[in-house]
Amino acid sequence: MAKFSLIILASMIFALNGCSSQVVNYDRYSLIEDVSAISIQSNYNVEVSLNESLNQLGIVLKTSDVSLRSANKHLWSSSLRSQLESIFKDVLYKENFAKNTSFAIYVNKFNGALDGTVEIDLSVAAFKNNKQIIFKNYVRKGKQDASGYDALVIKLKGFYKEICKEIVADIR
């Protein structure tokens, strides 16, 4: 009887061990691979805030007209907020933009959709000498060039850089 109990116990341990040894792979995506450290450390005053649905580790997909899903295995390499701030600082730095302007950016949409649509919707308030000089909404919507998360991230980054350059042009 004790031998039988020992065999059952050993079988249960092996079964539990098999369940816990499954490896889960996560893909991490970066928007700032080509951003220089000097741009990130520059003294530009940029503050990005995100719609709560974007405050996730996972890349967000629109699954219907009223639902969004944060991916479980396709994650941002670091906070989306800090990556978007870094990209905007990089654009400002490369454009030799004056550092006496501060920016408040609210990102409402920064997502893909199941049909391959990519969408960004954000507003920008810029201030110079404590006076608001611009308050404007910027939108981009289009299709991915290929399927998959890589293509989604590439398109989101491209759209966001376009918007950043447009903001700089609107203020100049």
Task: Give the location of each predicted region.
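Sec-dependent bacterial lipoprotein signal peptides
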Residues: 1-19
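A structural "domain/chain start" motif
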Residues: 17-77
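Surface-exposed short loop/turn segments
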Residues: 20-31, 90-133, 142-147
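Short amphipathic alpha-helical face segments that pack within enzyme cores
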Residues: 23-24, 83, 87, 162
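Short secondary-structure boundary motifs at beta->alpha junctions and helix caps
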Residues: 60, 65-74, 131-165
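Mid-chain, structured segments of secreted extracytoplasmic proteins
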Residues: 70-97
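Short amphipathic alpha-helical signal-transduction/dimerization elements
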Residues: 89, 93, 160, 164, ...
